[in-house]
Design a protein with these regions (language model features):
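Generic alpha-helical structural context detector
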Residues: 41, 200, 333, 348-352, ...
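Helicase motor core with emphasis on the C-terminal RecA-like subdomain
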Residues: 7-13, 17-26, 30-34, 38-60, ...
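Short, charged low-complexity linear segments at domain edges
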Residues: 371-403
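Flexible coil/turn residues that form the inter-helical turn or adjacent wing/linker of helix-turn-helix
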Residues: 179, 246, 390, 440, ...
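Accessory DNA-binding and partner-docking regions appended to nucleic-acid-acting proteins
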Residues: 1-19, 375-377, 406-624
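Short helix-to-turn junction characteristic of helix-turn-helix DNA-binding domains
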Residues: 43, 242, 293, 387, ...
Length: 624
């Protein structure tokens, strides 16, 4: 049994005024947002907390500020080296004593970090769950005065979550190893069941739970149906979408490594600075590719889910899913890479029936308990029901996460151009009956032809069926949309059948409910296709704050960006770690003439003012 760590009681005078002072001095912000102040107050008081805050909602501040104010070192458990590196570099730029321990840290650096931790020189120490489980790390941590333990991306703890990692399950023992040390678990994506699992697994039974709104008002969401599952057409659609946003930083998610490299190459052939990223590259190569994306303006990362949480670049203007993820949690997490600076951004998803079939087959191949598999299957269907539905997309997602009072966002594709729908209960009954009468042994095209009474070389056994030709009242396109919608709803299921997909009936009780007329079915009429020549251009993904500047202000902004790029290259850090675009815009607009005026701009904390203030003023002067 490891010894209990030493821990000093927090000073009685510690309150939110001190936290606000740190927020202003270090981060350059006047006050907290949303539930941040409530979470910070609980941790400062030494109480356990679980916080579910939206991506870009400042989750890390909720444990970073208490770690700075409370005596000792704040231990942060984070799932990815890239994520740790990003946060540690940002903290160092702000004058906070932070360090990380991972496979990329040399023995000499490790020794220096442990010395700093023991001597009280360190505010925050970042480690991975694997690192905690290996060697003597826990023993060494027991010799340190810990101010708190933060578990970042806490959804990784839960088997019900979208990114379950077994090593996270062992973090519950920290409650016994470090009794009395307050713990905070933070995540951006956890439904009620996942939240309960996190609390139980981490032994946070007495924790205060804070769940903020999942609203991301700066994100414009849209989804577009793929055509006939054609990979070439989907690739062409992705290329067109990216070209429309040329010069903007973005992320394109693909479902496979081959698709990732193919799309990246196609974009490069078209003059786009596209970078492929997937788990097939070795660690050093992935690090280099990530560094390029973080450092280069207008770069587009084409990635598999291996990219996931490993980026905190604030000026990503769009996220495109060439292939949908596996759940609404994963969807919200991944589109959350866009617009973290609060400026307008886009989340665009391309989807089709073959995608849901692929997602379900992938689940079948994973070793998991039957109950878990059923839950994950339901999550897949809930995602596709949202994508193919006619309800405001953010509203649907927010209600899924428990915000029952969520209202339409007013900016997604559904709100901007509400799709026409038709009552498809009777067509659904006909389609289900046709699949059943045909013995559940044909594919989508054959079923539609059967409903229309147009099967080539029809045999007498088929033409004698009661369902032959009963769908002549609908068009070919309408029937395809009905069948697709039934697949998305799980009323029909597609089996691969050795490369010749067939469709069969889905959940029997749900099918019976349709037959009885107890389940409403609304199908969208003729959805917009992704490869139409005349696609309306969107502007939600544009950095309006920067692009709307007049000529003189724009010139100052570009000079500041060039200065930032040079400083970032010298320090081998991403440019946004020095200053975000929106901070540079404020500087260009206000033209501060002295350090006091510069220090009053949001995003310019005391550390950055001291480090860069004179250089910024000189750069401004040169622009004039």
């Amino acid at each position: 049994m490891l010894a209990d760590p030493r821990r000093s009681a927090p000073p009685a005078s510690l309150d939110l005024s001190a936290a606000r002072e740190v927020l202003g001095r270090v981060w350059g912000h006047a006050d907290f947002r949303g539930l941040q102040s409530h979470v910070v107050a609980e941790v400062l008081a030494g109480r356990d907390v679980m916080a579910v805050l939206p991506t870009g909602g400042g989750k890390s501040v909720c444990y970073q500020i208490p770690a700075i104010l409370r005596p000792g070192v704040g231990l942060v458990v984070s799932p990815l080296i890239a994520l740790m590196t990003d946060q540690v570099e940002a903290l160092k730029q702000q004058g906070v004593a932070a360090a990380r321990l991972d496979s990329g840290v040399s023995m000499e650096e490790r020794s220096a970090i442990w010395r700093a931790a023991r001597s009280g020189e360190l505010d925050l120490l970042y480690v991975s769950p694997e690192g905690l489980a290996a060697g003597s790390m826990l023993e060494r941590l027991s010799e340190i005065d810990l101010s708190l333990i933060a578990i970042d991306e806490a959804h990784c703890v839960s088997q019900w979550g979208h990114d379950f990692r077994p090593d996270y399950r062992s973090l519950g023992r920290l409650a016994e190893i470090f009794p009395g040390v307050p713990r905070i678990a933070v995540t951006a994506t956890a439904d009620a069941r996942t939240r309960d699992d996190i609390l139980a697994s981490l032994r946070l039974g007495e924790a205060r739970v804070f769940v903020d709104s999942f609203a991301r008002p700066n994100l414009q969401l849209s989804a577009e149906r793929k055509i006939n599952g054609s990979r070439a057409r989907t690739d062409a659609a992705v290329v067109e979408l990216v070209r429309e946003r040329r010069g903007k930083s973005g992320v394109v998610y693909c479902g496979s490594r081959d698709g990732c490299e193919r799309v990246a190459q196609t974009l490069r052939d078209g003059g786009v600075n596209a970078i492929a990223y997937h788990a097939g590259f070795d660690a050093k190569d992935r690090d280099k590719r990530l560094e390029r994306f973080l450092a280069e303006d207008g770069a587009v990362m084409v990635a598999t889910i291996a990219f996931g949480m490993g980026v905190d670049k604030p000026d990503v203007r769009f996220v495109i899913h060439a292939d949908p993820p596996g759940s609404l949690e994963a969807y919200w997490q991944e589109i959350g890479r866009a617009g973290r600076d609060g400026e307008p951004a886009e989340g665009i998803t391309l989807y089709g029936p073959s995608d849901i079939a692929w997602s379900l087959r992938r689940l079948e191949g994973r070793p998991m308990a039957e109950e878990v598999k059923q839950v994950q299957t339901r999550k897949v269907r809930q995602l596709f029901a949202m994508l193919d539905g006619a309800v405001c997309r953010p509203q649907a997602v927010r209600r899924y996460f428990g915000e029952t009072d969520a209202q339409p966002c007013g900016v997604c594709d559904i709100c901007g151009d509400p799709p026409a729908t038709f009552d498809a209960v009777v067509p659904a009954q006909k389609a289900l009956a046709a699949v059943q009468r045909l013995g559940e042994r044909f594919g989508r095209t054959r079923v539609v032809d059967h409903l229309l009474g147009k099967t080539k070389d029809v045999q007498s056994w088929e033409s004698s069926l009661s369902t032959w030709g009963i769908g002549a009242d609908l068009s070919l396109t309408a029937w395809r949309d009905v069948i697709d919608h039934l697949l998305f709803e799980g009323l029909l299921v597609e089996d691969p059948n050795e490369g010749k997909p067939i469709i069969r009936l889905g959940d029997s009780e749900s099918v019976r409910a349709v037959y009885r007329g107890e389940r409403p079915i609304q199908v969208r009429k003729a959805p917009v296709r992704v490869v139409e020549a005349e696609r309306p251009r969107r502007n939600a993904g544009r950095n309006l704050a920067a692009e709307a500047l007049d000529t003189d202000v724009r010139a100052r902004f570009e000079v500041l960006r060039a200065w930032r790029r040079d400083r970032a290259a010298e320090q081998h850090v991403p440019p946004y770690v020095i200053f975000q675009d929106k901070t540079l815009v404020e500087i260009a607009l206000s033209e501060p003439r002295n350090l006091d005026a510069l220090g009053r701009i949001s995003g310019v904390g005391a550390g950055k003012l001291e480090r860069y203030g004179k250089d910024v003023l000189e750069a401004l002067a040169s622009a004039n």
